[in-house]
Amino acid sequence: MKKNIIIVRGGGDIATGTIYKLHQSGYPVLVTEIANPSAIRRQVAFSEAVYEKSYTVEGVTCYFAENLTRAYELLKQRKVALMIDPDGAVIREVKPAGGVDGILAKKNLGTTMDMAPFTVALGPGFTAGVDVHAVVETMRGHKLGRIIYEGNAIPNTGIPGAIAGVAKERVIHAECAGILYGEKKISDYVQKDEVIAFIYPDTQGKDASGQEKKDGAFAVRATISGILRGLIRDGYLVTKGFKIADIDPRESEYENCFTISDKARCIAGGVLEALLHAGILPE
C-alpha cells in the first residue's frame, strides 16, 4: 500500500483543481464521490468518472474504482482513483496522511479532524482548529486561496464572484423540479433568452406561467449572452432552485470550458501549501 495517500472528498470542478495539483506534485490521490454527482462544469470535473468510468482533465486521467482493492492498484500505478463513498467510510480503512473536504456544500457533511493526521476543508461551513486543521478561502478576491488555521472562511453570500462585471446573472438555477435535457452543449455560444435546456416535470400537467413548453417541458433560457461554460448532465433529476448552468460573458474565452479555472488553481495552491507546511510530503 502506498504511503502519504491524500483523500479528497468531492470531484467537482473546484476540487478537481486540487486533485490535479496534488497528483502532479507526486501525491497518491483517492477521490470519494456520491453516486450521482451534479457538476456543472463537467468538462473539468473528475466526478464525471462516476458516469464514464474514466475522465481526463488537462492530460490527467481519473479512474473509477469499484472497490478499495482496485483503488490501491490504481494508486500503485500512479493514477488518480475515484470511489463512490458519500459518507467517507473508506477514510477510516485507508488511514490517509491527509484529508481534503472539497465538496463545497457550504456546510460540513461529516468531515472531522480525526479522519487524518491533517485535514483541510475548502470554503465556508468549517471552523479551522475545531472541524478541520485548516480551511482554504474560496471567495474570489484578495483572500482567495489563503490558508486559515483559526476560524472560518468568508460566509457564503449566495452571489457568484463577478466575471467581466457579471455576477449573479451568469449562474442559472432550475425554476422547477424535473429531469433536465440540454438543447445546447458546453462551449456553445448562446444569446440572452435563448433556450439552452428543457426540464421535464415528474408530474405531467403542471403549469408554470410564462414558461415555454416542449412536450410538457419547461424551457431554461440563457440569462446573459456568452459561452455556455457549464451545464448539468442530460437526464439529471433537479429540484427547484438547483444550480444547472453557468455562462461566461467573455466571448473570447472558449478554451476556459476545457481547462481548470484560475480560482480552482489558486485554491489548489493553498491546499498544497497547507499539506507541505504540515510536513506531509509527496512520495
Protein language model regions, located:
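Well-ordered secondary-structure scaffolds
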Residues: M1-E283
